[in-house]
Amino acid sequence: MLYLPDTMSAWPWQRAINPYFNEVKAASNSWFKSFRAFSPASQKAFDKCDFCLLAALAYPRARKEHLRTGCDLMNLFFVIDEYTDVEDANVCRDMVDIVIDALRRPHDPRPEGEVVLGEIARQFWARAIETASPTSQRRFLETFIAYLESVVLQAADRDCDAEHTVQTYLAQRRDNIGSYPSYAVLELALDIPDDIFYHPAMNELSLYATEMLIIDNDLVSYNREQASGDTNNILFVIMRQFNCSLDHAMAWAAAYHSQLEARFMDAFKRMPSWGLEIDSQVEEYCQGIANWPRGNDCWSFESGRYFGDKGREVQKTRCVPLLPKKERDTSLRQQDVVITSL
């Protein structure tokens, strides 16, 4: 039996959901299904993950058109992860280059026979830029390309069975988890100048929230990953580095999460003032970052992504029966991606 520590019990930001959720979810999912990126069985498992719910919980105050960008982005993240998780670094490099090219030329048709990721990314970005401020567009591209590059690095790590320390693991996961382009969605209607946006206190908020997301994601995904033999998880890293049990690794991760919460609150309180107009935008953005860990935590238990239809029960009891181990199928490639469901 696996016991999940309640890392978010003291977090002051409470659950909120966007009122446009159902309407926008229907539109975004219909758009995504039109690409037929997965087999019918895998598409059904994908639907249980409810990535639009994640967006609605992460962006509870977003305008309808910006929630659509958030929903489409969550779907895009997922399909990129699924397609690249089964390929080596060279193939991932090719896929990433296609996606980057599509984002840079959103109004140009994609070549025939190209992997579907290119057209999904192109359509996503062509729609997003219609309602996004110029500064948010620039920052999104910068951070999303960094995420894509980290996908290639992760594939290279897989290829050589690289082992990380906690420090190096967190360093590579900060880009790989996709939080920074997700934060860019928070500023689609904003125009925060660079000298303020990159102020140390702002950078700290993003960093601490991101590492909280890494820990929370790895705690809830550990069961599936230990069963499939996927060791790209901070709990495996902690156990190996400190030669400790799973229970001790859980406790270490929870304690570090508490430290991150305290650091976040300290940085939040130290935020300078730049005048009424800028302060209101900074406040909106920082509140959005603070909400992300809460939204992610709620989605982890409200969707079927990690616990099937038992999420609400697990959220209350914190107890998860360990799944039996199964051999990882290393022969899978993008054309036969399999999304498992619980």
Swiss-Prot record:
Keywords: Lyase, Magnesium, Metal-binding. The keyword Magnesium applies. This is Delta(6)-protoilludene synthase 8. Belongs to the terpene synthase family. The conserved DDXXD and NSE/DTE motifs are important for the catalytic activity, presumably through binding to Mg(2+). It catalyses: (2E,6E)-farnesyl diphosphate = Delta(6)-protoilludene + diphosphate. Mg(2+) 2 binds at D81. It is an enzyme of class 4 (lyase). Terpene cyclase that catalyzes the cyclization of farnesyl diphosphate (FPP) to delta(6)-protoilludene. Its cofactor is Mg(2+). It comes from Postia placenta (strain ATCC 44394 / Madison 698-R). Mg(2+) 3 binds at N217, S221, E225. Its EC number is 4.2.3.135. (2E,6E)-farnesyl diphosphate binds at R305, Y306. Mg(2+) 1 binds at D81. A motif (NSE/DTE motif) lies at residues 217-225. A motif (DDXXD motif) lies at residues 93-97. SUPFAM superfamilies: Terpenoid synthases. Gene3D superfamilies: Farnesyl Diphosphate Synthase. One of its GO terms (molecular function) is metal ion binding. GO terms for biological process: isoprenoid biosynthetic process. InterPro entries: Isoprenoid_synthase_dom_sf, Terpene_cyclase-like_2. The record marks F78 as: Plays a critical role in the stabilization of intermediate cation. The gene is STS-08.
